[in-house]
Amino acid sequence: MSQIAQPITIRNTTFKNRIIKGAMSEALANYEGQPNDLHLGLYSAWAKGGLGCAITGNVMVNFEAKNEPGVVVIETERDLERLKEWAAVGKQYGMVQLIQLSHPGRQCPKGLNKETVAPSAVPFSPALATMFGTPRALTHEEILDIIKRFANAARICEKAGFEGVQLHGAHGYLISQFLSPLTNKRTDQWGGSIENRTRFLLEVYKAVREATSESFIISVKLNSADFQRGGISEEDVISVFKAVDEAGIDLIEISGGTYEAPAMAGAKADKRKASTIAREAYFLDFAEKIRQHVKCKLMVTGGFRTVEGMNAALASGACDFIGIARPLAVETDLTDRLIAGQDVRYAVKPIKTGLPFVDKMAIMEIIWYAAQFKAIGQGKKPNPKLSPLIVFLNYAKGNIKAVVQGRVNSRKSA
């Protein structure tokens, strides 16, 4: 049996194979952050395609802190019945589902929320300052409230029938902002030393663990590096991985980058050593290193394109799961094909509109794939040749209309 086809168990949940869909922003929810039939259609397509596990796109824990329009928000049990339908889609086809819980912190476009908050009031680089405003530093009480929100959202996810959650601690979102010395300038218990900067993540994990059952899976997505000068050091990264592993985390997904240095979207020049390129995965070298320090399951996402490369990564022991994201946006049956020995069919090329100020941002990658997700959710086939420029213009038109009408910030409990 191929390595990728072998089942594996975490707590009481068996994953039928080693392929996990990495989180990608769906942007399919309505203005009130509610999931709908498009989510059911999209995840049903992946489940029917043999996927072992799907990690959802960002699900926000606070309606007033959304990273983009169309994001799902879980604050209350308002949408419990719809969430149950979503969870049932996976169970019908034996696909595990982990809801990715997140808070964007400062990483929110201007005009989307009334204000942005972060560990510290650190502005974005000049290149992105026109799109993202300077945040307000969180108070101690607000930090505790956000921790409770993560726990409450996880509780609701379990009640709905999902097998677990993933805490988004990468890509420059709030947990990542606490971890990085570039965005965390605090001098209290939440900042300073790496132990203090890790405190928020650990407190979120502990709160989620206490709010859910022993069989509920808790994963976290962490950066191997943020690829910014003065950012978190490798020594500190290893410390974070060890701390969350010792706390009892079940699965760590290894990623990297932020909106200011978007390695997660494949936007950086490829400076990996030749041996890593030959083995495909962006973060496999780091996985091999961190494997010596942690006992939990590891997942590497980014760059896998051949069955041989995936099987080799699993056989090496560097990781337990293969994360695949963008190829699944244009090949919903990819998992079945991989297990049958066929490689990724479509080469995933950088998404370029021809507009320099747009193309330098990771957001273009996100919205192009979101357009594919909408088509899949409607029962249509994805289109690998879809024009990025047309997608961007439609996205910009829709967002400007939403902000002008004031519907994005309409306050209804989620």
Residue ranges and their predicted role:
Residues 1-414:
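Flavin-dependent oxidoreductase catalytic cores
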